[in-house]
């Protein structure tokens, strides 16, 4: 049967009987023999607006199904804020100390973090470092100059393309204006010619109508002589019987 170590964090106002009754209900009466309260009361972070709590630790042997039942009951118990279950057969418990590592040929002692490393294997003079820094700065400056020049050329090319596009648009606009002006002038000329022709036709038609009226109108004026009257009557078309 696997061995477990269970640590629970309870509300600081809760009683020890809560965890005691829970362990007896799930694991039996003998499960609380190794139950003890830890001295630690501070929390790493606030739980339910509280920075202190009660810590309880217990070691026991139990099957997996009882551990699941304990988890279920602990989740529905309001006074139990947190819990941690450790399988001692596969993991290290909270009270166990780590074993001292055996030193062998493959193990080297780790350097203390306060010890300064030794960088004297390849010492360099201050002048060499300055020369290297100056060379690096010069390379960076040249690289920046090249980048700026390439960027300036790219911007100039883009501006030239934009200017050509604007000029082309202006030319197209002027051409369209000229085409529209010529089209309007041509339409106006055709309209004027048509209007003049219509007026001329109307005048001709009016003149012809007036002549026809004068030609076929009977003479009623007594000033005309008899000869003119006969000539007029002879010109008048005879109606067929």
Swiss-Prot record:
It holds the Pfam family Ribosomal_S6. It comes from the Bacteria. The keyword Repeat does not apply. Disulfide bonds: none annotated. CDD domains: bS6. Keywords: Ribonucleoprotein, Ribosomal protein, RNA-binding, rRNA-binding. GO terms for cellular component: ribonucleoprotein complex; ribosome. The keyword Iron-sulfur does not apply. Residues 97-108 have a biased composition (Basic residues). Residues 97-241 are annotated as: Disordered. Belongs to the bacterial ribosomal protein bS6 family. This is Small ribosomal subunit protein bS6. It comes from Mesomycoplasma hyopneumoniae (strain J / ATCC 25934 / NCTC 10110) (Mycoplasma hyopneumoniae). The lineage of its organism: Bacteria, Bacillati, Mycoplasmatota, Mycoplasmoidales, Metamycoplasmataceae. The gene is rpsF.
């Amino acid at each position: 049967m696997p061995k477990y170590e269970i640590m629970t964090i309870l509300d600081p106002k809760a009683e020890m009987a809560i965890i005691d009754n829970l362990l007896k209900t799930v694991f039996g009466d003998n499960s609380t023999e190794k139950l003890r309260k830890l001295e630690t009361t501070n929390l790493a972070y606030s739980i339910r607006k509280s920075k202190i709590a009660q810590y309880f630790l217990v070691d026991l042997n139990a099957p997996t199904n009882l551990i699941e039942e304990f988890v279920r009951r602990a989740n529905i118990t309001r006074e139990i804020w947190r819990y941690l279950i450790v399988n001692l057969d596969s993991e290290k418990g909270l009270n166990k100390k780590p074993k001292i590592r055996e030193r062998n040929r493959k193990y080297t002692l780790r350097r203390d973090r306060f010890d300064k490393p030794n960088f004297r294997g390849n010492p360099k003079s201050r002048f060499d470092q300055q020369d290297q820094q100056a060379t690096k700065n010069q390379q960076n400056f040249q690289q920046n100059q090249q980048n700026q020049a390439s960027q300036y050329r790219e911007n100039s090319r883009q501006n030239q393309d934009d200017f050509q596009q604007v000029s082309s648009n202006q030319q197209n606009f002027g051409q369209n204006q000229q085409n529209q002006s010529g089209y309007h002038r041509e339409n106006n000329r055709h309209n004027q010619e048509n209007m003049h022709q219509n007026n001329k036709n109307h005048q001709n038609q009016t003149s012809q109508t007036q002549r026809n009226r004068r030609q076929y109108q009977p003479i009623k004026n007594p000033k005309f002589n008899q000869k003119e009257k006969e000539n007029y009557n002879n010109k008048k078309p005879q109606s067929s019987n």
